[in-house]
Structure formats: C-alpha cells, structure tokens
Amino acid sequence: MQKYVQSDYKHDPFHLFSTEHVVTLAIISLLAILLFLFQDEVKQPRASRFLRSLFVFLLLGSQIGYQIWMVATDRWSVRTSLPLQLSDLSVYLSAIMLVTKSRKLFVFLFFVGIGSSIQALATPDLGMFSFPHIRYILFFISHGSVFLSCLLMAVIGTYRMGQRSLWVTVLLVNVYGVCIFLIDRWLGANYMYLTKKPGGSSLLDVLGPWPWYIVSAEAITIASFFILYWLYRIFKK
C-alpha cells in the first residue's frame, strides 16, 4: 500500500480518458443524476443537513489530505501548492457556502465552481499519478465534491439569479485573474496557467499560443457561464 502514497510512483502515468478516468467521471455523473431524480427526498431538512455536512467533510478533508501529502513527500512549494487555482479556491468557498447557505457564494460558485470543476475533472493535471494513488483519489473527491455541492444547493435552494449576477461573476473572475497574474510574476509561478500552459493535455492546447489562449479561454468562460445560466433558469421554472 505504501507505493500508493509515495511521490515517486512506479506505475502507469495518468492518461486522459483512460478506463479509470471514464469510470470516475461516470460515478460523479451518476451521483449528479441521483441528486435530481431524488430531489424531493434531498430537500427534506434531515437529508439536506446530512448531505451538506458530508460534502463539507469531503471538501475540507481532501484538501487537507492533499496539503499533508505534499508536505510529507517534500513536494510542497509556494510556486505550485497554494490553493490559488479557481478550482482549488472553489473547494474552500463551497465548504463555506454549504455551512452558511450564502446566496452570493452560491451564485459565484454556480458559475465558477461548476465551470472550473468540470474542466478540472475532464482534463486533470495529474502527471504520473493514476488510480489508485492517493493523489488521484483526493483530486477527484475534491473537485467532484465541488461540482456536486453546487448542484445540491441548486436543488435545495430557492436562489434567484439574473444576468447581472453572471456579469458580476465575470468581473470578479477577471479581477482575481489580474491578482493571480501579479502573484505568478512575483513567485515565478503559474497559477491559473496565466504564464504558460499546463504540462498535461488540456483545453488550452487548442487555443493558440500565449497570450492568445488566455483571450480564447475568456470567451469560452463567458459562453459556458451563459449556458449554465440558461440551464438554471430552465430548472427553476
């Protein structure tokens, strides 16, 4: 078992859309479908409290576990290990949202949390760490829980959302991106992949060279926000 927690993993590296990856995505998708199929049961106070508590535990537990693993294996670095990616930030904000039921956090995370978690789940930057390594397991628990937490709050909540909320979220993401770019320059880091593309396969590979892939990613982000907004309006009719 020790080999599944070591940083020098002697196993097949992670392959995008391998059998293990597809099965993991299928499990998360099935859980999402079950949330909607059993939404009347999920809305019951006892069930909703249990699910919110469960996801808070999974979100924080997976992130704390990841940070402990990074430190224990001497992989932790201020340039790579701070929770500054949008998907990582969404983990902590999702935990706060589940506890407080904040409308503002829900609106922000419905766009950013779902959008970033889908991208992270579909094109994870895992390098050599394939299933059943602890890095793989913690990664998918973390980002899968963000995705499912946002869907859970969409099901049990009565939040109203207009186009203004969409554009405020776009503005906040861009302001955050500028701050992260400055941090990247200061640390020599690559948070949010603003200075170069990630090493593994990702959507950015088809969006052109730096800095044009950032402009293309911005357009895709806005388009995806509109799709999520449209789906939410249909669901809440």
UniProtKB/Swiss-Prot annotation:
GO cellular-component term (any): plasma membrane
Membrane-topology annotation of the record: Multi-pass membrane protein
InterPro entries xrefs: CHP02206_TP0381
TM spans (from-to): 16-36, 53-73, 80-100, 106-126, 137-157, 167-187, 212-232
Keyword Membrane: yes
Main location class: membrane
Record's keyword annotation contains Transmembrane: yes
Entries under Pfam families matching the protein: TMEM164 (PF14808)
Keyword terms of this UniProt record: Cell membrane, Membrane, Transmembrane, Transmembrane helix
Protein name as it appears in the record: Uncharacterized protein YwaF
